Swiss-Prot record:
It holds the Pfam family ThiG. 1-deoxy-D-xylulose 5-phosphate binds at G164, A190, G191, N212, T213. Keywords: Cytoplasm, Schiff base, Thiamine biosynthesis, Transferase. The gene is thiG. It comes from the Bacteria. This is Thiazole synthase.
Amino acid sequence: MTTEDTLTIAGRSYQSRLLVGTGKYQDFAQTRAALDASGTQIVTVAIRRTNIGQNPDEPSLLDFVPPSQFTLLPNTAGCYSADDAVRTLRLARELLDGHDLVKLEVLGDPQNLFPNMPETLKATKTLVDEGFKVMVYCTDDPIQCRMLEDLGAVAVMPLASLIGSGMGILNPWNLRLIIDQSSVPVLVDAGVGTASDAAIAMELGCDGVLMNTAIAGARDPILMASAMRKAVEGGREAYLAGRVPRKLYSAAPSSPTEGLIAAAK
């Protein structure tokens, strides 16, 4: 990849298009090892579940993942209302000395973790009005994604399938519609299970992929993080290169048809 092909979010550019979560690892040391193997530059943190200073007597993620080396992306995992999400991100901004790039997710059901879009839209408006730069976990509905962009979201993050399901990309057509209409980055968020899922997302034209369970839940998280790094890079290169059209039959054989040696009679 060239240095010119960067992911730009809220005016800041990144070489890596892979965003990685920090939950579900054995400990903070394994978290850091996986992040290093992934090559990520943006690390998402569940404020309600991860200590970043709100519990001074416990180990802090920031001791292993310092803001000087990574862009931290506080998220609202576990929030089921706009009010809870807004309060959580206000706390994150206070703990991180005014940090304003955040990931909003407002869940609608504790079993499937599907986004509650009315509450998500409500929270997006409030956060944007308060000066946050909001990346939004959302459904793969193109209309809802357009509404989020109109409200001022700096990135839309449609799910590929349910959070933690590992089912991969179930609706590539909606993702294509969202990509084609959006003027902000589109990143797949949720559902990636293995490297090929990440590659497909990038081949579709997504600007990036965010994942946690696919790496942290793998038998070897460090090796999977490395695999995901290569998959995202390879998928992006394939998208830029441009795939050949799908055809039922080959209109032009790749083997030469001229200059063939005639069979002896």
